[in-house]
Amino acid sequence: EYIEVLINNAGIRKDNLMLWMTGEEWSKVLDISLNGFFNVTQPLLKNMLVKRYGRIVNIVSLSGIQGMPGQTNYSAAKGGVIAATKALAQEVAKKKVTVNAVAPGFIRTDMTEGIDENEWKKHIPVGRFGTPEEVADLVGFLASPASSYITGEVISINGGLYT
């Protein structure tokens, strides 16, 4: 028995302008996202490679692609996972293990609680925040055998924001 599909979906925000960011705010965010990716993924890789099948999907963020003011730590952490996704995909592709990332934009979750949706949806071409179900559908596809020719990709799901 082994784990065929791994979804790395850890992340916290400790938003602050870098000028006033504490070392703890920086370290905590990077530890959860970037070190979390390593600490969960690395022990599971060997069995995926031996069995010659695996799907790894990393949940990142538009902040990791675009960078957002007040989120230098979060942007760096998610950007690091994006780079690791691309590198690891090249390491394991020949063993039929795919590694991809999903970069949600504004999705109605605890992470966007407190953000003024009416203000932000003016900037989103589809005119609304996304739903967790829409993200789950994309992740489900990437976790399936149907996605066997997709690896090392970062797929944005953001209603057309920052494309």
Task: Go through each PLM region and give its residues.
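Residue(s) in the substrate-gating loop at a strand-loop-helix junction
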Residues: 61
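Active-site loop immediately N-terminal to the catalytic Tyr-X3-Lys motif
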Residues: 19, 66-72, 94-95, 127, ...
